């Protein structure tokens, strides 16, 4: 058969893998999982050993044909690193480390670096379980890194190995996660509360920022929010760009109803302290066991919900009731958590030239005035998590910590940032920031597909350069942003700066 020329074949009995299996094949102990396609046909489980630099995958596909899984890049599937396998009608299995030489054609690697751990087929599923090193010496193997990784999954209806667009899927995943939810405590008295907009008619405009005041859960004593997640209306996932919850002082007089966040009513724009949030591709996030968001005390602020809608198809008659779901408990954590927004001030002169292979924006935060701004002595802050944010031209971000003119560390980074995967991530270890430290945010953009200037702004086709640091203990500092020298920028552009 032609398959014998394409695959390395193994006798079924030599592998000790029965053809008939239960739904999931061999018992899986892999901690992480998600579907890779909109129809939930392809299900991936994975886990890894950081010390050994080995990662294991289990791909389960609703097919009796071949299955494949691997790593690809941002721009083309050609060159993708793909491990393929299946079970032939005679009971033999095939398994091979390959790469794409054309959009639909695979070629076997000279070095076989994937190890088969199990391959089964039943009346419904084909399940392939294998491991591979993070890195190999094979030029056709793409690395598994601590950045966002674009994975490719494909399958056939039979054992004829050829890729078809309708059965090939690419998804961005942060594979090397630091914490798994099973590692964290779940309080027995958990209460769920939804912070949501209600039956909001999304305007037919490209960009809308809708804000509304949110009454907090009514509790008689202090509680802690320990987890949050986006609550999206089905079919509106691609229209909701981000959801943020901001804090407003208890003395704030907040409007009722839903209004433009940055429009005529200044009350909304005065609420700038980010509490929790989610953006494109974001999922649930649980705080470390010793920190939580405080609610139920006289000092706790009022909240505003902000939803950014990107309706670039100008669809009429679309209603939305999206928001943020929070989980809270009376079991108090040791620390109240907070969020520090860093980056480049978006308005009015953040700009990126067209046709740029690489363009950098920098936002510098100097913390020596933090105690003065806080209005009280401020202890060192401990950073445990972060959220990266640019729009479509963003390619990479990082936050770097300096002390006394010396670089201490890169707090967080992603050299393969994807706008479609913006999620809160944990740091491998907590980072201490002292007053006087300098925090530099670096954003890398690419605009090869644009023929006009890209300006900073609220629309998805505008740009931003932001990193949100999750930290404790709580203080009164909400943001620390870099702001360019307007006179210098105007001079470089050959323009005259106005007041």
From Swiss-Prot:
Binds 2 copper ions per subunit. Its cofactor is Cu(2+). Residues 40-156 form the DOMON domain. GO terms for cellular component: extracellular space; secretory granule membrane. It holds the Pfam family DOMON. One of its GO terms (molecular function) is copper ion binding. Cu cation B binds at residues 389, 391, 464. InterPro entries: Cu2_ascorb_mOase-like_C, Cu2_ascorb_mOase_N, Cu2_ascorb_mOase_N_sf, Cu2_monoox_C, DBH-like, DOH_DOMON, DOMON_domain, PHM/PNGase_F_dom_sf. Disulfide bonds join 211-261, 248-271, 365-480, 443-465. PROSITE patterns: DOMON (PS50836). Residues 1-16 form the signal peptide. The active site is at 209, 389. Its EC number is 1.14.17.-. It is an enzyme of class 1 (oxidoreductase). Keywords: Copper, Disulfide bond, Glycoprotein, Metal-binding, Monooxygenase, Oxidoreductase, Signal. The keyword Oxidoreductase applies. Belongs to the copper type II ascorbate-dependent monooxygenase family. PANTHER family: DBH-LIKE MONOOXYGENASE PROTEIN 2-RELATED, DOPAMINE BETA HYDROXYLASE RELATED. This is Putative DBH-like monooxygenase protein 2. It comes from Homo sapiens (Human).
